[in-house]
């Protein structure tokens, strides 16, 4: 949690939400409940949010996660890069772990450590206001209790996040090794570490562990667990598939030129 910051006057709040009705609701609510922090500055997409935040330096920014042009997570990264003292609340209908992990990594890499909150849009108004007040006035990090488990799980490395997409797209260990410039053994050890993070496994050496290894296809279960927790989504997979198609075209040629098809 960031230390208390003495903000220069005037203080303000930024609301970044692409849904016009929700944006208007938040603007009117916060202007009424926190009059000392007016004006409330509206933004309809992530790019506009970054532009306003870096120009006006609001005390608090409330960012929807899924917005046109730039996601709320990427907007927060751009804002904190120039203005780490700014407090940010992620207000979302889609609390998938792919976003939560990205937020945690950004917070961890930002100096000084920023103050932030993460809350579901379905919360009642009185709880939302208490939540905002804690971040805005007290400088407290606030996580919606419904998602505390997601924030406490082991963070995936860049390779592990990438490997999940490759598993979902059906790549073999051989292909992953070529794509990531690793040995097959290196891929196997890294995937084993990924599986340990994804699964609550049976105690090592027990009959239950032996049974589970026979009963489940680990790669398929990893894909299921990633979907269940929101560690991958269709947009990420479509982007990864397009990038892979270009890589496959280059790698097939290299494979052929190296005489490995014989």
Enumerate the predicted regions with their spans.
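Conserved long hydrophobic alpha-helices within structured protein cores
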Residues: 18-26, 84-105, 179-201, 220-229
């Amino acid at each position: 949690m960031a230390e208390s910051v003495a903000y220069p006057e005037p203080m303000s709040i930024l609301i970044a939400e692409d849904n016009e009705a929700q944006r208007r609701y938040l603007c009117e609510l916060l202007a009424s409940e926190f009059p000392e922090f007016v004006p409330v500055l509206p933004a309809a997409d992530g790019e506009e949010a970054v532009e306003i935040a870096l120009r006006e330096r609001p005390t608090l920014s409330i960012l929807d996660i899924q917005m046109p042009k730039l996601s709320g997570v990427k907007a927060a990264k751009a804002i904190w890069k120039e203005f780490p003292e700014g407090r940010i609340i992620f207000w979302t209908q889609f609390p998938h772990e792919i976003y939560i992990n990205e937020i945690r990594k950004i917070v961890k890499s930002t100096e000084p450590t920023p103050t932030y909150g993460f809350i579901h849009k379905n919360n009642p108004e009185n709880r939302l206001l208490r939540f905002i007040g804690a971040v805005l006035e007290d400088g407290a990090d606030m996580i919606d209790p419904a998602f505390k488990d997601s924030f406490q799980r082991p963070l995936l490395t860049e390779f592990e996040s990438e490997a999940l997409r490759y598993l979902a797209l059906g790549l073999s260990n051989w292909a992953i090794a070529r794509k990531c410039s690793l040995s097959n053994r290196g891929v196997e050890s890294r995937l084993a570490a990924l599986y340990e993070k994804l699964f609550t496994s049976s105690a090592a050496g027990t009959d239950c562990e032996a049974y589970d290894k026979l009963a489940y296809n680990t790669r398929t279960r990893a894909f299921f667990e990633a979907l269940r927790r929101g560690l991958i989504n269709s947009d990420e997979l479509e982007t990864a598939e397009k990038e892979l198609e270009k890589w496959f075209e280059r790698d097939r040629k290299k494979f052929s030129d190296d005489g490995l098809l014989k």
